[in-house]
Amino acid sequence: MAKAVTIKVKLVSSADTGFYYVAKKNSRTMTDKLVKKKYDPVARKHVEFREAKIK
């Protein structure tokens, strides 16, 4: 079987609330770390979410 192109990554909140999203990423075209600005319901505001590995 062929290796999957898309991988799942965990987007962890930079506000250190412990909240995270799970996103898909194309590992061939996006080689750098994924950073998105999304809503953190624990902090109740929009913050940066940075990529981390899913354990």
From Swiss-Prot:
Keyword list, A-Z: Ribonucleoprotein, Ribosomal protein
Keyword Ribosomal protein: yes
Gene Ontology terms, MF aspect: structural constituent of ribosome
Pfam family, one: Ribosomal_L33
Biological process per Gene Ontology, one example term: translation
Keyword Ribosomal protein recorded: yes
GO annotation, cellular component aspect: cytosolic large ribosomal subunit
Protein family: Belongs to the bacterial ribosomal protein bL33 family.
Designated name of the protein: Large ribosomal subunit protein bL33
Natural source organism: Bradyrhizobium diazoefficiens (strain JCM 10833 / BCRC 13528 / IAM 13628 / NBRC 14792 / USDA 110)
